[in-house]
């Protein structure tokens, strides 16, 4: 699956808590992540637009055309990098957006308020993102009063898989890229390049570990140990949450949590998903769950597409 866009060195530098350390002459970013690289982050307009609209106006029919509001399954895309808030300026990527946990939570909350919305489909195309952001979405899904289906399309990896694991069921294509359960915190060191270019790093710091991870200084074994400690803690929490969400033995999840991903067919065999299929499979699942006919299940237009019209 290395030819998939999400898999183009997804694990190089990724997105979790962005720690920005700045002085008048120094800016650097260190990133911890459950998956997707910063270079891969492309997403949608934030949902500020709908705050002045009624909840009903978020969910229009996608299958029948027009703005008639008779659809009963909300469709929420989770694409690109998952972060807590959308803040392109702080990421230094003006004009690009992420999948914001705050936005996803808001839309799920709105869907819960609308009586005619009987279920929620998460349409996942994501290599992952921030641990906390992924956890926030997952917890919201677990607490949802309406049934939730996660449909993994091209990819549902790492933090995005954590999100999917909280749904009532997970459906994926036989060719979907699934899993990649693990945590990464990597960066490109500039030390040798700086020496080659005649640049000297001047460290002014109070606090022994304040500059740990600065790419312009060498990383000691002791400092590496600090990072590995944190990675191991986050990894253990991720494995535990997925184990609980999927109702699978933690040892079974741990064996699968080596950072690798797998196609949907193997994910089904390993218990990471529940069924192979696409949107029509989702339709059939909701029809059975809600005691309706298949033709009575109508998917709403994805909420970001609605926002694009405003």
For each of these PLM feature ranges, what is it?
Residues 175-183:
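Active-site loop architecture of trypsin-fold serine endopeptidases
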């Amino acid at each position: 699956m290395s030819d998939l866009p999400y898999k183009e060195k997804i694990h190089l530098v990724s997105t979790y808590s962005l720690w920005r350390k700045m002085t008048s002459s120094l800016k650097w970013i260190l990133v911890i992540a459950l998956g997707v690289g910063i270079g891969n982050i492309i997403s949608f307009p934030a949902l500020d637009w709908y705050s002045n609209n009624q909840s009903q106006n978020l969910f229009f029919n996608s299958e029948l055309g027009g703005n008639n509001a008779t659809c009963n399954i909300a469709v929420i895309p989770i694409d690109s990098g998952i972060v807590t808030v959308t803040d392109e300026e702080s990421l230094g990527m003006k004009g690009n957006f992420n999948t914001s946990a705050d936005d996803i939570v808001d839309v799920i909350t709105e869907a819960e308020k609308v009586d005619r919305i009987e279920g929620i489909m998460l349409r996942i195309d994501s290599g992952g993102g921030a641990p906390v952001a992924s956890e926030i979405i997952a917890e919201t899904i677990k607490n949802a009063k309406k049934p939730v289906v996660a449909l993994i399309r091209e990819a549902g990896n790492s933090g995005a898989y954590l999100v999917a694991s909280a749904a009532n069921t997970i459906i994926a294509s036989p060719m979907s890229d699934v899993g990649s359960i693990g945590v990464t915190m990597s960066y490109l060191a500039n030390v040798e390049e700086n020496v080659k270019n005649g640049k000297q790093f001047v460290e002014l710091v109070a606090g022994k570990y304040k500059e740990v991870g600065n790419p312009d200084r060498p990383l000691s074994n002791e400092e590496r140990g600090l990072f590995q400690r944190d990675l191991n803690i986050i990894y253990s929490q991720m494995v535990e949450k997925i184990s609980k969400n999927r109702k699978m033995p933690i040892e079974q999840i741990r064996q699968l949590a080596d950072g690798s991903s797998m196609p949907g067919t193997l994910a089904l065999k390993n218990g990471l998903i529940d069924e192979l299929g696409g949107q029509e499979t989702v339709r059939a699942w909701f029809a059975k769950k809600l005691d309706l006919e298949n033709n009575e299940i109508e998917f709403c237009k994805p909420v970001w597409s609605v926002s694009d019209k405003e």
